[in-house]
Amino acid sequence: MVFRIASSPYTHNQRQTSRIMLLVLLAAIPGIATQLWFFGWGTLVQIILAVISALSAEALVLKLRNQPIAAILKDNSALLTGLLLAVSIPPLAPWWMVVLGTVFAVIIAKQLYGGLGQNPFNPAMIGYVVLLISFPVQMTNWLPPYEIAATVPGMADTLQVIFTGHTTSGGDMSTLRMGIDGISQATPLDTLKTSLHSGRSVEQIMQYPIFSGMLAGAGWQWVNLAWLAGGVWLLAIKVIRWHIPVSFLVSLALCATLGWLFAPESLASPQIHMLSGATMLGAFFILTDPVTASTTNRGRLIFGALAGVLVWLIRSFGGYPDGVAFAVLLANITVPLIDYYTRPRVYGHRKG
């Protein structure tokens, strides 16, 4: 008889993991479709590039480690990592950026720690932060939503810009980022951060085309509502628990409301925080990662609330417009401590 010595975790249900990942991917469809509608074909191209890169990088590492490639790839975790990173970056970012970010996420942030179940940080957010710090200009080159865009690129222009940096007619990103008012556009949170630093008040900024007649910015409020719909479905079918998304959103809403009441001229309103940027994507699809989140119910409440406070602090006082990725990683650091102090009491033992 031959005994095989394996490292922890000792129990691993491959089929269950694959099914959960697949359900999360299905829940992402409304968010992906809405981003495609408002920002064009670039979102789909980035997803394809990221998924191919993630699967290739994972297969390469598994081969080097003499692990079963096909069996592990079937858990769909690499596919989900690529997808989450792809929908987080600008649709027309250069092709090599999403490849670099995805490869870094899979190899360094996941496989270097031993693979699925052993990584302390969310791999997709590690990849995103590496790209944001290394290439800040390219990572803020979001297109204006089609409803306020002067030019809406088709598939040919999209591919041309992603792979060459220019449209078929010789234009570049500055042309595509032009709004109907002739002014280069950015995301609502980018616009808010830049304009506040220029001395404008929140009331003045709300008159910009990207905010005009909107709760939280053209396109972005619908994107967030779509991710919310997918997240609610995940809750309904019990793929994720309510503790993290609810505590995160309540914490963010509470901080945003208090800040707005005390400084309405310099701090964004609650609806902007709730329905702009990656709020709903983070709440339901990123923070709820079972590997990098707290494992106790009380711990999940603390973990989500902490992330909500961090998002508000970074958005309001930090150097980056959207703080979801940094908040997730900072909250990941605290998980061992949170789990230690929130672990259930063992019956028959006194509290020590």
UniProtKB/Swiss-Prot annotation:
Its EC number is 7.-.-.-. It is a multi-pass membrane protein. Keywords: Cell inner membrane, Cell membrane, Electron transport, Flavoprotein, FMN, Membrane, Phosphoprotein, Translocase, Transmembrane, Transmembrane helix, Transport. It comes from the Bacteria. GO terms for biological process: electron transport chain; transmembrane transport. Belongs to the NqrB/RnfD family. Part of a membrane-bound complex that couples electron transfer with translocation of ions across the membrane. Required to maintain the reduced state of SoxR. This is Ion-translocating oxidoreductase complex subunit D.
